[in-house]
Amino acid sequence: MHIILTGTGLVGAIALDAMLQESSIDKITIISRKPVPQAEGQSKVEVIIQEDLSTYSDETLAKLKGAHGCIWTAGPPLMAVTRQEYEYGHIDLPVKAAKAFAALNDKFNFVYVSHDGCHDTRAVYIFDVKARAEEKLFQLHHDPSKRLEIKTKGGIEEQESLSSFVLYCIRPALIDYSTHDAIKPWLKPLPLAKKWTNGVILPLYRFLGLTSIMGTSQELGQAMKDLVISDGRDVDVAGASPEGRCLGAVGMRNWTQARNESPEDTVAV
């Protein structure tokens, strides 16, 4: 099975680590703006260096032909770009990729990494951006009955669904990777705010048992990997979104537990 990955930050590293351990995945193509040290020496990984993720050449699409799915983790940090660039990176680019990748196979799973609570906290800019991205991507999902209620001010342009496009959204909140040693060598030095979160906030939340807004990197990795290799059916686990296409922190925890206990009871893989 051939899977595409975009994004080389924390979530991308988590996704790659999970897929490297999955025997059913025999090829991983990473589309990245720069080399990926984590992929070096991994025989089933190919890295395509591409600065512009808005368009894909015939040569690149030929290399991707037959892929089963994509985990999309790419997106610039807010502090590094303008708001226009941020929206382009988190909304427009995944939508463009979704349209291009949908033609790679008869059924193509697209796992978009969003954020937990994004539709309930749209007053927060970064959450609103993720919610808008989900609204647009769900327009493309092969089953129009799964489309989200459009709450973006002014609405969005309606688009036809793509018969081959199968969407899942993964919605992490705080990610605890304190015990995920396999990815630590590949992570960039943390800015002060992230160090504060990892050193103070996460331990405090663990102590207080506030698990509804945090999850482990292992849970996140398994959920992303399982959905991208799945047969595309709805997710049937406590904590999944009402339409059965999205998992937040609680859903991912329940998903991991269900998969470990009874793999046949969740999405077939």
UniProtKB/Swiss-Prot annotation:
Residues 1-15 form the signal peptide. Keywords: Glycoprotein, Signal. It comes from the Eukaryota. InterPro entries: NAD(P)-bd_dom_sf. Glycans are attached at residue 254. Induction: Expression is positively regulated by the leucinostatins biosynthesis cluster-specific transcription regulator lcsF. Gene3D superfamilies: NAD(P)-binding Rossmann-like Domain (3.40.50.720). Part of the gene cluster that mediates the biosynthesis of the lipopeptide antibiotics leucinostatins that show extensive biological activities, including antimalarial, antiviral, antibacterial, antifungal, and antitumor activities, as well as phytotoxic. The function of lcsT within the leucinostatins biosynthesis has not been identified yet. This is Leucinostatins biosynthesis cluster protein T. The gene is lcsT.
